[in-house]
């Protein structure tokens, strides 16, 4: 037993040497009040289910303004031909209106056109499996409580993926908690109020439960972070099949590289 405790303490000491170099821009899929410092950039690659990859680049234009682009590819890993989500990249834009103080949260407004999963194109029906946030506003508040603890709540409206007729304003919330200087645990809930139709053209059955996601982030070095995330823990979506319905709970790996220019 003593050997096990000693081994755990040794691992903890080994993994507390590096910490995240900037406030998190996102939890798993929803934004926070964090922006990139001026003159920095991140290159991020998301490895998704079904062999999909989602690379993205974000730039710190000023300390309060971050701009990014992303481009999704399905079935990139595996055999056969891969499929592009779209022929052009999606856009992310964040502007911090108010800095966080001891008494007030930070306030960020933004735009994110990147949805989750595959982009589905049918006659009169064009959207991602999970809609993009669109325009949003998010409030973030952090507390130094045995390591940083951050709470985030926001509202969003998708102005682009509305062919299903569901144009409701949506809500999301989440938190991130430092375990030590290297590891952070994250969880989020997207109410999906604008994405709760029971059946979209027989492609996806939605149960109206929203999307519950969680993840673990490791700051491996000052420039590199790795994440393991679990999506749709609430099993909101099912994918009809000839014999069975498959739920959409899935795992993904995210690789984030941070640098100055």
Regions found by a protein language model. Give the residues of each.
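Sec-dependent N-terminal signal peptides
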Residues: 3-13
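Transmembrane beta-barrel domains of Gram-negative outer membranes and organellar outer membranes
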Residues: 17-149, 155-160, 176-261
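Short, surface-exposed alpha-helical recognition segments that flank or form part
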Residues: 163
């Amino acid at each position: 037993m003593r050997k096990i405790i000693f081994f755990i303490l040794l691992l903890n000491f080994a993994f507390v040497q590096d910490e995240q170099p900037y406030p998190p821009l996102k939890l798993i899929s929803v934004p926070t009040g964090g922006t990139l410092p001026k003159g920095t950039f991140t290159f991020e690659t998301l490895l998704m289910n079904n062999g999909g990859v989602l690379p993205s680049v974000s730039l710190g234009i000023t300390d309060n303004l971050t701009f990014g682009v992303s481009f999704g590819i399905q079935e990139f890993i595996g055999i056969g031909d891969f499929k592009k989500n779209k022929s052009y990249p999606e856009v992310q834009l964040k502007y911090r209106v108010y800095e966080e103080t001891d008494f007030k949260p930070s306030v960020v407004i933004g735009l994110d056109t990147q949805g989750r999963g595959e982009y589905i194109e049918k006659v009169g029906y064009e959207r991602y499996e999970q809609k993009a946030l669109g325009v949003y506003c998010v409030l973030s508040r952090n507390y130094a409580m045995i390591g940083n603890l951050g709470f985030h709540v926001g509202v969003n409206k998708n102005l682009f993926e509305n062919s299903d007729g569901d144009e409701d304003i949506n809500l999301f919330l989440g938190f991130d908690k430092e375990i030590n200087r290297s590891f952070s645990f994250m969880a989020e809930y997207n109410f999906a109020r604008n994405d709760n139709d029971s059946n979209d053209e027989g492609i996806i059955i939605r149960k109206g439960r929203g999307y519950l996601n969680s993840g673990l982030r490791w700051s491996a070095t000052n420039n590199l972070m790795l994440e393991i995330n679990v999506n749709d823990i609430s099993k909101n979506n099912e994918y009809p099949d000839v014999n069975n319905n498959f739920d959409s709970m899935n795992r993904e790996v995210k690789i984030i590289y941070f640098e100055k220019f």
